[in-house]
Amino acid sequence: NIKKSLILQGYYFSNVTSSIKTNDNNTVNIIFNIDLGEKSKVSIIEFTGDKFFKDKTLRNIITTEENKFWKFLSGKKYLNQQNLSLDERLLRQFYLNNGYYDVSVNTSTATILDDDSFKLTYNINAGNLFTVNSTKLDLPIDYNPLNFTKVEKLLNKLEGNKYSFNKISKIVKEIDRISLSREFDFINASILEEK
């Protein structure tokens, strides 16, 4: 458990040993010797697969950074499992917001380069570029459509453009805002996406 905890903090090359010392009063002391070593740094970040974007663009999306001499204060250059999970989510969101509805970002792999550094590889399958063909707002008959003109305009702007999760989320938030301001109790904003 100690080793796992150290790895989560970026000490992949740490060494933990234990020893037991027997005392005169029928008790024992358990002694853990921990050599942290250096924190593991990311020397190279690469992206493979059908990514459709340059590596430089994708590096600007993720939080993990390559170790460079001018980044001596940055904590983002260290290999960290939580950051890797965040990076995968950020890459997925980036692709979803750029029209790649079926994107998959496969688990990143870290390859040991030397005593304290790794090469980090993200495998991306962007899939096809999706555009929005048509949009439609279905309202109950007792709702005034004039209350939803802004939503209609936002929906119309989507048509013919690349699919964007952020833009769709903004529309749902606008519907929620209208329902709160107009005190509509039973609005259920849902998006039906068809391929």
Describe the residue ranges of each PLM region.
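Periplasmic polypeptide-binding modules associated with outer-membrane biogenesis and secretion
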Residues: 1-195
